[in-house]
A protein has these predicted regions:
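N-terminal leader/targeting and assembly helices and adjacent pre-domain segments
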Residues: 1-86, 94, 98, 165, ...
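Activation/maturation switch segments at domain boundaries
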Residues: 1-8, 12, 16, 20, ...
Length: 186
């Protein structure tokens, strides 16, 4: 692991410099440097992965592709590093969140939609309590005005798949939302 590598490199460098001091990996400055390095590596790795995945999804969207074609693109990107179900989870999570974000933005721009209604898949794979901390069965049918958040899932979400939600609430979510149109007062 990285801490072991830092320790080994530190000890080797002290030996190379012929300094007879024990390398202290628990020294506050060393711990701080280790944490900063880990944070930087994680951030850069995530940024790089995000950029590459964004390109994959943008290309798929431009081509009008669905989840099966996206799975092929993800398989080519990840190779053997991810299983089929992991790739499907990535594709489903990203397309669900993206589609629902697009719906919400369209409603905001429409001037005829006043709110939304949460629509769950309602099958044996739909999240429900007590099996899950998040309840998409109970969320089914919840209505909110534009600008308000859905809360019945166990968290406040702007839409199904909202990335501000916890992983357990949005990963593999298959829910969508339906518009509530302003009634004509004729």
């Amino acid at each position: 692991d990285l801490l072991r590598l830092i320790t080994l490199a530190g000890k080797e460098e002290l030996a190379r410099l012929r300094i007879e001091v024990d390398f202290d990996v628990e020294r506050p400055e060393t711990v701080a440097a280790y944490r900063e390095l880990l944070s930087s590596i994680a951030t850069k790795t995530n940024e790089t992965t995000w950029d590459e995945l964004s390109d994959i999804f943008e290309d798929a969207e431009r081509e009008g592709e669905g989840i099966p074609a996206i799975l092929e693109r993800l398989s080519a990107y990840y190779g053997d590093r991810k299983s089929e179900w992991q790739l499907e989870r990535i594709a489903r999570t990203t397309t669900t969140g993206g589609a629902n974000a697009g719906l919400l933005e369209a409603w905001r721009q429409s001037e005829v939609v006043e709110g939304g209604e949460w629509v769950s898949a309602l099958d044996d794979r739909t999240r429900t309590s007590p099996e899950s901390d998040f309840d998409h069965v109970h969320a089914h049918g919840e209505t909110v005005r534009l600008g308000e958040l859905y809360v019945r899932t166990g968290e406040s979400l702007a839409y199904p798949g909202d990335p501000s939600g916890s992983p357990g609430n949005i990963i593999n979510c298959r829910c969508t939302q339906a518009p509530i149109v302003i009634e004509d007062e004729e």
